């Protein structure tokens, strides 16, 4: 009942409690490994508990995905590959890549400047890399991908170097299409997050708080604004997403409210406010423009800057795609918003006495 009501929060509390108690009772770690092996072996009781935990987790995370507007074509988790690991392990064995080390099975990567990759524990249980190998083969055989991107924190750099090298050593050249898109860690208001220590900030709580704070700002600045709840949702969620994507992905970032929700600066709300201003101008322009304007009269530096940034946008998007670096787009968008606002404040727009302003 506590898990059903508490969802991911309750499961996290169990996780923290387990590791705290394991510090004084090492036998818990052994019991945990035993139950993990039971899951891999398809034990009925273990699978019932595992499936229940998974359903509770997916139910909670789906609310976050809905808030972010994110959807997935496949929700295949680690357990999906339980019955797909044996053929991969057998191929490693047939190709002479598996060696025994203290009862465990490893792939020796010393020649490539990496420690051995542990494939099977002494009790036969698998590890992350075993499941990732099975997943890689499944994805290649199912999707025949040109690129397979792993968006995972930079702490896993070694893991993915080992993964890709093992697939290469197995003789499969499609490893060349696999890439680890690493990213930095996030701290909250100056404090590092740690699940094991129990200091976590749930994304759903963060997004809801962002919407709440955005609503307060809107009430203060624009009390007569229609659809305040929807605008608050867009501004709040947008602020969190933009804050994350505005930084180079490999840099650690410290999330702070006063920066994320600032309407003046390199933030989501600033860009959204600028977009709203542009839309307002365009609505007024529909009624104002009686004839096709003469664009050749747009010669001032401010307008030229805006036009240049707009023209460069497709190249920026392509470069961001090639380098898997979304901050290129957010930074360019910020620059465009700044350039537009500079033009907006320094020039008259839709003024019949100023053809350049009307054309712009």
Where are these regions (language model features)?
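NTP-dependent nucleotidyl-transfer catalytic core
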Residues: 1-360
